[in-house]
Regions:
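Carbohydrate-interacting/catalytic domains
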Residues: 1-35, 77, 81-87, 373, ...
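Active-site-proximal helices and loops of the catalytic beta/alpha 8
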Residues: 131-135, 149, 154, 221-223, ...
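Active-site clefts of carbohydrate-active enzymes
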Residues: 335-355
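Substrate-binding/active-site clefts of carbohydrate-active enzymes
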Residues: 33, 41-229, 247-257, 273-275, ...
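Hydrophobic faces of well-ordered beta-strands that scaffold small-molecule active sites
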Residues: 34-36, 91-93, 141-143, 234, ...
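Active-site rim elements
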Residues: 66, 208, 235-238, 350-359, ...
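Soluble or luminal CAZymes and related metallo-dependent hydrolases
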Residues: 68-75, 122-126, 213-218, 242, ...
Length: 517
């Protein structure tokens, strides 16, 4: 390719590779998967030799809680057996691309190079090896994409291709973090523009996807990574902060290339109607379609956390919150494409927020996560019920390295074994992947529901009360009458007869029963 500007001529060699065979038909992640979220720099240090490099500003310093610790791609590769044995079938690592900020670069969300892996994580070639090795174990890879903003150290910041390549102001102008302005019929134009054009943070210039060449750049960038690295999905950071029309066009281009691909967007808001607005296929009042197949289920995340952080005795508290959240399912275009979770890298660890840090409450949360509709995601370390005792609300403190070997306590191993059995079982149950849901009004801090299809059903009864509860089996006849009421607890092998009226579930525990015809 020859580039000319005035009397200057520059030639660049550009390789056009053959597309992977069958690439268009690639299958993305879906509700049969369990996603394992990794904070890349903090997870596992598999190659200490790359912790600091001459070309990157911030060096590794494990004594600095806000600094880099050395986690890397090799650490993920070394942990594939741990992840597979847990029952996870997909991995979402936080951004692995270059982030050359002088401080806080460990999080990776201030990109300095969209086409190269940060050398402290590895290389493009090693990333491809990770994908290949993961695929050999039946594990998909989801790439964390950040088109909303770049980093202040990105090379183009020294010489912007266009003045409007980024959204610029006379003085630093922060977004107000209230993206409801995008669908609020009463919103001012001032608030709407500030939502989309304000910077997420000082070292994160806001990209202007209304510039058609930038939009094309990001479309080609995303498609290139799919083809080059053979990835299985994308997670889009801060999706509603992008101008919504070009954001939809960006996703439309990707989905046109890969109709069966899946992309999940971070739409961090709690009201279900607001989350539903951003899912592709939503019947929106303004006709807008995001082209985003999957959205994160923040309403259910909040409901489960609130249900288990207290004793649930207050009016409308406890598991009633989960029941209420699920009643909003009618709002969504596709509930099987809701990304469900108990926590992530931006919120206090689940084991820290449940009442008394009780592992029994942690298990209740995990059973709900494994059996409710949607695509479950587990934050690394939660398989051990990891906590951040120094400061549970500090992002840096909750993102500590995964315990390895002798660092794993007896209690942590017991929790891992429980979750491994749970998610390995889920992996083999299509009724949990695509079955319908029938639930019953939450009473006395309990919640009973069925996932079912024409041939089988899974019954789940969660008791978050501090005393035993009797299952109101007589209330469930409208669905149990369609199956053999004698079923099996898949985690214990115990036979359970749901026609009986005296089945008690101990305090702070769950019961699962698989029914067939």
């Amino acid at each position: 390719i020859t580039l000319k500007k005035g009397k200057r001529t520059t030639s660049v060699d550009y390789t056009i590779n053959t597309r992977r065979e069958g690439s268009r038909e690639r299958q993305g992640f879906n509700s049969s998967d369990m996603i394992y979220l990794i904070m890349s720099d903090r997870f596992v240090d598999g190659d200490p030799s790359n912790n600091s490099t001459k070309d990157t500003k911030e060096k590794a310093d494990k004594n600095n809680i806000h600094g880099r610790f050395g986690g890397d791609i090799q650490g993920i590769i070394n942990s594939l057996d741990h992840i597979s044995q847990l029952g996870a079938t997909a991995i979402w690592p936080t951004p692995l691309l270059g982030d050359n900020e002088a401080q806080w670069s460990y999080h990776g969300y201030a990109c300095s190079d969209y086409y190269h892996i940060d050398p402290r994580f590895g290389s493009n070639e090693l990333y491809c090896q990770m994908v290949e090795k993961a695929h050999e174990k039946g594990i998909k890879i989801i790439m964390d994409m950040v088109p909303n903003h770049c980093g202040s150290t990105h090379w183009w910041m020294a010489d912007l291709p266009y003045k409007d390549w980024i959204n610029q102001f006379d003085n630093f102008t922060n977004t107000h973090n209230c993206f409801s302005a995008n669908y609020d019929i009463n919103a001012s134009e001032y608030d709407r523009l500030l939502s989309n054009r304000g910077w997420f943070d000082r070292p994160m210039p806001d990209m202007n996807l209304e510039n058609k060449d930038l939009l094309k750049y990001f479309q080609q960038w995303a498609i290139w990574w799919v083809e080059y690295a053979n990835i299985d999905g994308m997670r889009v950071d801060t999706y509603p902060y992008i101008e919504k029309v070009p954001a939809s066009e960006w996703l439309a281009a990707i989905r046109a290339e890969y109709p069966n691909f899946n992309i999940v967007g971070e739409c961090w808001t709690r009201p279900a109607p607001a989350v539903a607005y951003w899912q592709s296929g939503a019947d929106n009042f303004d006709g807008f379609d995001s082209n985003l197949p999957t959205v994160m289920d923040f309403p259910v995340e909040e409901a489960i956390r609130q249900a288990l952080e207290t004793d649930g005795k207050n009016w409308g508290g406890g598991l009633t919150k989960v029941y209420d959240a699920v009643t909003m399912d009618y709002l969504y275009a596709d509930v099987n494409k809701l990304f469900t979770f108990l926590g992530n890298h931006d919120m206090a660890r689940f084991a820290d927020i449940v009442k008394d840090k009780d592992p029994r409450r942690v298990k209740i949360g995990n059973v709900l996560l494994a059996t409710m509709r949607g695509i479950p995601q587990l934050f690394y370390g939660d398989e051990y019920a990891m906590t951040a005792p120094e400061d549970p609300n500090s992002h840096s403190h909750l993102r500590m390295p995964l315990p390895l070997g002798d660092q794993v306590t007896k209690e942590q191993q017991e929790m891992y074994d429980f979750q491994s059995a749970l998610f390995q079982w889920r992996k083999k149950e299509p009724v949990l992947h695509t079955g319908r849901t029938m639930h019953f009004l939450s009473r006395d801090n309990t919640y009973g529901f069925f996932r079912y299809n024409d041939n089988e059903a899974v019954f789940v009864f969660a008791n978050a009360a501090e005393e035993a509860r009797t299952i109101p089996t007589a209330n469930y006849k409208e669905i149990t009458s369609k199956y053999n009421t004698v079923g099996v607890n898949p985690l214990t092998g115990e036979t359970i007869d749901l026609s009986k009226t005296d089945i008690k579930v101990p305090a702070l525990s769950t019961l699962i029963v698989k029914l067939t015809k």
